[in-house]
Amino acid sequence: MTNQQDTLFAEPGEHQGNFQFDSRVAGVFGDMIRRSVPGYTQIINTIGEIADRCVTPGSNVYDLGCSLGAATLAIRRKIEGRNARIFAIDNSEPMLVRAEENLSAYVSDTKVFFQLADIRDQTFENASLVVLNFTLQFLPPDDRDTLLARIYQGLNPGGILLLSEKLKFDGVDVQALLDSLHLDFKRANGYSELEISQKRSAIENVLIPDTLEQHKTRLNQAGFTQADLWFQCFNFASMVAIK
């Protein structure tokens, strides 16, 4: 299924209220995230490369908040012949429907199980890789520690958690600089001032970012002794944590 161009916020007053991963967003999400998140394609490709290095035969992989299935597809392409299973989980039915359609276009011997569920209710077992690709930031902050602790418990020794997030910064000047660079990135990708403003208003109470230090502290408290940044562009970053 092809993705449409993102024009959801192109007209004044469109889609007022909090941002939701509904059918309208699902239809344009592929275009939206590439034009909004610097380095997104690199992150997706590297998720596949990390999977190639860490997914062990017969183990489980969890893609939490799988959206359109980009990470799931990148992983599946790299782990053929390992008898591993991928659980692609999202609480948005429109997203999950499109993810399943997207992956059905490619033949693979790796089983993918699509689950319409709240990732906070997910159990983890025999996991070699868990992916939270721009997902944790949408959970209530009070629920984040518990989820990461459960992920850690379900990972096999040597298993990896890959965590991508939008960051906030303690330094006011640094925050302003990186926000400015990110805005220019979106302008360069064709978003108007109106679109940028309206989406910001819709998402600011839904996406609640943490600092890098908060992420590292949370991962350490969950049990990870090795957790560090592997990618950052402006205020978007990805971390790898190894059990």
Curated annotation (Swiss-Prot):
Keyword S-adenosyl-L-methionine carried by entry: yes
One BP annotation, GO: tRNA wobble uridine modification
GO molecular function: carboxyl- or carbamoyltransferase activity; S-adenosyl-L-methionine binding
EC number, as in UniProt: 2.1.3.-
Catalysis: reaction(s): prephenate + S-adenosyl-L-methionine = carboxy-S-adenosyl-L-methionine + 3-phenylpyruvate + H2O
Residues at which S-adenosyl-L-methionine binds: Y40, G65, C66, S67, D90, N91, D118, I119, N133, R200
InterPro entries on file: CmoA, Methyltransf_25, SAM-dependent_MTases_sf
Class of the enzyme per the UniProt entry, highest EC level: transferase
Annotated keywords: S-adenosyl-L-methionine, Transferase
Domain of life: Bacteria
Role noted for this protein: Catalyzes the conversion of S-adenosyl-L-methionine (SAM) to carboxy-S-adenosyl-L-methionine (Cx-SAM).
Family stated for the protein in its record: Belongs to the class I-like SAM-binding methyltransferase superfamily. Cx-SAM synthase family.
Cited HAMAP family: Cx_SAM_synthase
Assembly and oligomerization: Homodimer.
Name of the protein: Carboxy-S-adenosyl-L-methionine synthase
Species of origin: Shewanella amazonensis (strain ATCC BAA-1098 / SB2B)
Phylogenetic classification of the source organism: Bacteria, Pseudomonadati, Pseudomonadota, Gammaproteobacteria, Alteromonadales
